[in-house]
A protein has these predicted regions:
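Flexible "arm" and connector segments at domain edges
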Residues: 1-62, 66-104
Length: 104
């Protein structure tokens, strides 16, 4: 099946459900360690795309890294919306938005 881009927006909860439905069986077979290694590899590809300053490649690689991080979260039972919620009201350290932490 060829990739298609859409303008559809997904909540983190919806993303986790779709990643689970699409890749969950393979992720469980690969295990946490193997899936984590794939995520690390994708983060490396994000770094390469950043250095190349290629917006299309960067979007692609960030999408891949997000999908693999979502797989890791699914395997270890982390709800990404709950994990991200600590940033809703600003910086979790100083409580401000924008952040006013020293050295940040």
């Amino acid at each position: 099946m060829k990739h298609r881009e859409t303008e559809a927006r997904l909540s983190l909860h919806e993303l986790q459900a779709r990643i689970e439905a699409t890749f969950g069986e393979r992720d469980r077979a690969r295990g946490v360690d193997g899936t984590f290694r794939w995520w690390v590899e994708e983060v490396g590809e994000v770094a390469k795309a950043l250095r190349a300053r290629d917006p299309a490649e960067l979007q692609h690689e960030i999408g891949d890294a997000l999908a693999w991080l979502t797989s890791v979260a699914n395997l270890v039972g982390v709800d990404l919306e709950r994990a991200a919620s600590r940033f809703v009201d600003g910086c979790p350290r100083c409580g401000n938005s924008p952040c006013t932490c020293p050295g940040a």
